[in-house]
């Protein structure tokens, strides 16, 4: 993980996590189907289930007041993906039953830190991803907090995530350490060909929102 400095949210600094998940599914699913004789499907982000709740129910972390999954080891800087199956839980070695999700201590740090909550506005991350013109108020918030894409303010305020970062939490997966872009510039964006651009999580809204945001930050 970087030290936090930059204008791109942590999750979008590496290549697109969807790319990693697709490769993971391609390796795991054929082996699972061969072993169990059932159908398996992988999902990441676009999923038929509420991923953060399901992950908490699976014991992978607690749900924060910012709706993020918070892992004890990694804080909220985690990606959630899942493989669903037609197999019965017992077939896969699970005892069955429906566990309940777990929740954070509700200290309120994330909500207090968010510059948008008190104003009744959209998450700053959503503002950075909007297409078209921003309102004067939205432009002011974007320039004040310096994000070209996404926002980590509520996550960085969370004491559970702070503890994970202080402990030096780092993913062992090399993919997420390679070719990172903590700071995006107009020059860096212009030098990306379409293939490279499409390998980034910030590409899904096209180049225009990014260019607009970068121009605002440079004013």
Predicted features and spans:
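Extended alpha-helical surfaces
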Residues: 162, 169-188, 199
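Alpha-helical packing segments of well-folded alpha/beta enzyme cores
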Residues: 24-28, 110, 154, 210-214
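Long, compositionally biased charged/polar accessory segments in the mid-to-C-terminal portions
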Residues: 195, 203-219
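Auxiliary alpha/beta "docking" domains used to position bulky ligands
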Residues: 1-103
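Iron-sulfur cluster-binding cysteine motifs and their immediate structural context
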Residues: 109-128, 146-174
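Short, charged low-complexity linear segments at domain edges
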Residues: 72-98, 117-139, 190-194
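Short Fe-S-cluster ligation motifs
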Residues: 134-153, 182-203
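Short, contiguous, pocket-lining structural segments
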Residues: 75, 99-109, 143-150
């Amino acid at each position: 993980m970087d030290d936090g400095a930059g204008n791109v949210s942590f999750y979008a600094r590496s290549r697109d996590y969807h790319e990693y998940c697709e490769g993971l599914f391609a390796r795991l699913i054929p082996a699972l189907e061969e072993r169990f004789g059932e159908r398996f499907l992988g999902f990441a982000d676009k999923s038929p289930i509420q991923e953060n709740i399901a992950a908490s129910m699976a014991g992978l972390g607690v749900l924060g007041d910012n709706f993020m999954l918070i892992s004890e080891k990694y804080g909220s800087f985690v990606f959630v993906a899942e493989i669903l199956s037609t197999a019965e839980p017992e077939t896969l070695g699970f005892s069955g039953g429906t566990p309940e999700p777990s929740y954070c201590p509700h200290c309120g740090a994330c909500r207090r830190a968010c510059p948008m909550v008190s104003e009744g506005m959209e998450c700053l991350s959503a503002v950075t991803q909007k297409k078209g013109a921003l309102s004067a108020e939205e432009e002011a918030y974007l320039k004040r907090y310096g994000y070209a894409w996404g926002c980590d303010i509520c996550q960085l305020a969370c004491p559970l995530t702070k503890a994970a970062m202080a402990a030096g939490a780092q993913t062992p997966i090399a993919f997420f350490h390679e070719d990172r872009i903590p700071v995006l510039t107009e020059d860096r964006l212009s030098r990306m060909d379409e293939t490279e651009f499409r390998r980034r999580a910030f590409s899904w809204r096209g180049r225009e929102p990014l260019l607009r945001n970068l121009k605002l930050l440079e004013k």
